[in-house]
Amino acid sequence: MLHTTIILLVIALLSLVAKDLVLVYASLLLLGLSLLKAVPVMDAIQKPMFHVGLFCLMVFLLIPIAKGKYDFISLGKEMVSWKATIAILAGFIISYVGGKGLSILPDQPVVFIGVTIGTLLAVLLSNGLPAGLIIAAGCIALLSRIFNF
């Protein structure tokens, strides 16, 4: 229990320094649940929270369409460009890699802690965006298969 408390506090503090308030709040929420020994609650919310996060991201990304920023004609013209082709390919590859990352994260906490620290350092040192945890874990999963580590 003490180890869990320390780890979550360190993540919260590093996140606060990096100004990643989402991770601060998540760490503190889970710290509270951990201190309350609310393991059944954490088990119950783990899978749905991933889907809630994806839902919020999709809403954010679809708002310009809902506001009428794009129409069929402009989208049709854009979709036959090289940029669109590369974007589709990139989306496919990143989604594939992300799927591999999602499968490795629950079973290997060292990967999560490592990519979290790397993400926080990127935010602190280079104005990075804390958006690549699952993709980074996917890269680790693929590399570990290739190099057997």
From Swiss-Prot:
GO terms for cellular component: plasma membrane. It is a multi-pass membrane protein. The chain crosses the membrane at residues 6-26, 48-68, 86-106, 120-140. InterPro entries: UPF0756_TM. Keywords: Cell membrane, Membrane, Transmembrane, Transmembrane helix. Its main location: membrane. Pfam families: DUF441. It is found in: Cell membrane. PANTHER family: UPF0756 MEMBRANE PROTEIN YEAL. Belongs to the UPF0756 family. This is UPF0756 membrane protein BBR47_12340.
